[in-house]
Amino acid sequence: MSKQQIGVVGMAVMGRNLALNIESRGYTVSVFNRSREKTEEVIAENPGKKLVPYYTVKEFVESLETPRRILLMVKAGAGTDAAIDSLKPYLEKGDIIIDGGNTFFQDTIRRNRELSAEGFNFIGTGVSGGEEGALKGPSIMPGGQKDAYELVAPILTKIAAVAEDGEPCVTYIGADGAGHYVKMVHNGIEYGDMQLIAEAYSLLKGGLNLSNEELANTFTEWNNGELSSYLIDITKDIFTKKDEDGNYLVDVILDEAANKGTGKWTSQSALDLGEPLSLITESVFARYISSLKAQRVAASKVLSGPKAQPAGDKAEFIEKVRRALYLGKIVSYAQGFSQLRAASDEYHWDLNYGEIAKIFRAGCIIRAQFLQKITDAYAENADIANLLLAPYFKKIADEYQQALRDVVAYAVQNGIPVPTFSAAVAYYDSYRAAVLPANLIQAQRDYFGAHTYKRTDKEGIFHTEWLE
């Protein structure tokens, strides 16, 4: 009896759609789910597909060609460990487990180490694109043993999204947890993008009182230019969608933004690495404060503040917000890629930042036209410390910073919260400042804790008895 070329464990929507994607590229696929009903459901809903169901782990593993290639699409955390433990008794040395879940990168590092010691290969793989991407072509970020990756690369290359230039949106990222780390930062950037867009929406509503149709038209125009991206594209559609009662749906959606924790992981890692990931972290905090709905409603009746005044000329203000949004987006990506550099150094991954930007160009949630600009920047200078220093991004910052400053000033004066726009200005000015007031902080630390300090006028480490 012939054996299948790859197996997929986990028949929730992402696992199901990836299995169908793989099958559609000409591969035979074994499928397994912990609950029999899920597997039966997938088979019943997809007659004629080369999906072969198995109902015990042993039969599933034995159905695969060697070295076995097994894609795990199960709940991250304990669920992943349990799935691996159930597979191990039936695996042989050299078999490959691919974890395609939203896994914390430190867990991937641990699993890679443990499984390697037992002779198995483990590829922690970030998969972005949601349900549709999984079925039609996601952006794929694999990390682990390079030789094991080569054995699964043909499949991953065939199922990945394809950019406009014909290149598949998959590349080997690096050792152990590198793939899941890049996916984590991708998700952090996604948080930043979404919050920046939400603040632009708030400014256009609060400052110009634009109707939903006007908002949709504005975002349609934006999507035809520098801001062309998946998130801008779907946002224009959201503005005009109506419910069964004829109401604009976005206007009746509760203003509490949920999260699954991946943005938090990105910010936690930034703290561990000493990286100033301020904009993305503010986007995480913005979701947290949005969840305090009852407190916010109560506070709105107690705490005073300015009432938003008209922002002036409509076309002029819309253009200012557009420019502010684009520069804010650049700052967000500059922070994210700076963190990737710090992580690459810390974990010895040797990341290729230009290649990472390339695989974000299609399939994933943050896909955008300007990602090619990032690839170009790293092609010109692979060692550039920060994307803001690249010629294209410096030019945009020179031209657009006044709009960002004007928009933030308007928002502050009119009581419109813009945490990520504000963070973009603060980061930009801090990064370009040759001198910051941190000298005073060092003096304070030395005063109360004898933490010492360095001087600008002489070498050495100093401590002062401040009360003498």
Swiss-Prot record:
The active site is at residues 183, 190. GO terms for cellular component: cytosol. It catalyses: 6-phospho-D-gluconate + NADP(+) = D-ribulose 5-phosphate + CO2 + NADPH. PROSITE patterns: 6PGD. It comes from the Bacteria. Pathway: Carbohydrate degradation; pentose phosphate pathway; D-ribulose 5-phosphate from D-glucose 6-phosphate (oxidative stage): step 3/3. Substrate binds at residues 102, 128-130, 186-187, 191, 260, 287, 445, 451. Keywords: Gluconate utilization, NADP, Oxidoreductase, Pentose shunt. Disulfide bonds: none annotated. InterPro entries: 6-PGluconate_DH-like_C_sf, 6PGD_dom2, 6PGDH_C, 6PGDH_Gnd/GntZ, 6PGDH_NADP-bd, 6PGdom_BS, NAD(P)-bd_dom_sf, Pgluconate_DH. Homodimer. Catalyzes the oxidative decarboxylation of 6-phosphogluconate to ribulose 5-phosphate and CO(2), with concomitant reduction of NADP to NADPH. This is 6-phosphogluconate dehydrogenase, decarboxylating.
